[in-house]
């Protein structure tokens, strides 16, 4: 080895060059950003009441969090959003930021392939074009990865997604239907406090989600396809009976004739169902979300429903009934949370689960044993 280069190691060659940091500076900035993403309660409330979408989104994220401190703060925010500036509980139809404007919550369901995304965008653009502020939410307890199809639908609702009077939010989270429903309902409260006077709640997936959405909205709309029976569409009679309007989508081109025939059939069918306690007979109509044909009429149907229900007091009574249901659900959730997080119960549960699994104890005996000393 050349004596002149004898002591030139890799380190000595790099002499004078500042060594790289041991910690990724960008990672630190991201960590600090995440820590600071949660605001104080007054900051959340100020942003929500001003209609700040960024803060509204952060507040919804706070609601979705499972951390106990986040949940406590979320409840503070929700309580304030449900009050008037005087501190009184809100009348059923008055939004905090709406200054007395009547709002309406609309549930929208339909089988896959019915054109729900296109329909929501078409009706949504019509609603915002009339000067309303629209929030689009979803209820989907089924997906742990995609968080509901509305995430994909949002990219298909390009025009509505960039509408300054529209706010699109994916499903609260995957998990139990009750948990998702609670978070969706709380998201509705925040959106209304932020000035969104029209809220669409979309059901994603199948099963009991339609019933849950019905329990949190004022008007329930069922999208149908022409040329397919109920069995092929996977629609149960109970879901049809829940609907305030049955809209046959894709009524255009070669499909228009079949859509008209289907409309006549469904019109006959709804008259055979037991009458609603409100006296409202579900309206059957056609539309083409693709061409926007019939979309304005659907909004007129919704307004006619709201006017009729308000005149007879059904609208208010429905909201009050929903509040009572929320109250009982909240009790059940609180009791379950306190029960399952109790240290003594958690330990005993694990022991009893082993005995039930092994067959040395049947489930009913295990339950009796769990509550024997309580």
Predicted regions and their residues:
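Nucleotide-state-sensitive switch-loop elements of NTP-binding domains
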Residues: 40-51, 56-89, 100-106, 111-114, ...
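Long, basic/Gly/Ser/Thr-rich N-terminal segments
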Residues: 1-58
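Long, well-ordered amphipathic alpha-helical subdomains in the mid-to-C-terminal portions
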Residues: 56, 286, 297-374
């Amino acid at each position: 080895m050349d004596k002149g280069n004898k002591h030139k190691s890799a380190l000595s060659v790099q002499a004078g060059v500042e060594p790289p940091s041991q910690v990724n500076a960008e990672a630190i900035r991201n960590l600090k950003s995440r820590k600071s993403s949660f605001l104080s309660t007054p900051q959340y409330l100020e942003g929500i009441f001003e209609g700040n979408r960024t803060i509204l989104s952060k507040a919804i994220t706070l609601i979705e969090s499972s951390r106990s401190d986040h949940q406590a703060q979320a409840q503070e925010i929700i309580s304030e959003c449900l009050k008037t500036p005087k501190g009184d509980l809100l009348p059923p139809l008055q939004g905090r930021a709406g200054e007395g404007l009547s709002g309406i919550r609309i549930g929208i369901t339909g089988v896959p392939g019915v054109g729900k995304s296109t329909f929501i965008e078409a009706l949504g653009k019509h609603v915002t074009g009339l000067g309303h502020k629209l929030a689009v939410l979803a209820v989907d307890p089924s997906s742990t990865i995609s968080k509901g199809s509305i995430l994909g639908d949002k990219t298909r609702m390009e025009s509505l997604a960039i509408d300054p009077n529209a706010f699109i939010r994916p499903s609260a989270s995957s998990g139990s239907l009750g948990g998702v429903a609670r978070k969706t309902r709380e998201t509705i409260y925040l959106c209304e406090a932020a000035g969104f006077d029209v809220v669409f709640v979309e059901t994603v997936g199948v099963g009991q989600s339609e019933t849950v959405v019905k329990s949190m909205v004022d008007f329930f709309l069922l999208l149908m396809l022409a040329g397919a029976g109920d069995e092929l569409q996977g629609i149960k009679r109970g879901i049809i009976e829940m609907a305030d309007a049955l809209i046959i989508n894709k009524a255009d081109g070669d499909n228009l004739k079949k859509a008209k025939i289907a409309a006549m059939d469904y019109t006959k069918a709804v008259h055979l169902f037991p009458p609603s306690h409100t006296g409202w007979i579900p309206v059957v109509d056609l539309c083409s979300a693709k061409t926007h044909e019939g979309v304005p009429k659907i909004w007129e149907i919704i307004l006619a429903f709201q006017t009729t229900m308000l005149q007879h007091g059904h609208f208010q009574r429905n909201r009050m009934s929903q509040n009572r249901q929320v109250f009982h659900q909240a009790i059940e959730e609180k009791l379950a949370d306190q029960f399952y997080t109790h240290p003594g119960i958690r330990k005993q549960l694990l022991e009893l689960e082993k005995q039930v699994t092994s067959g040395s104890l049947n489930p009913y005996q295990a339950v009796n044993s769990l509550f024997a000393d309580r």
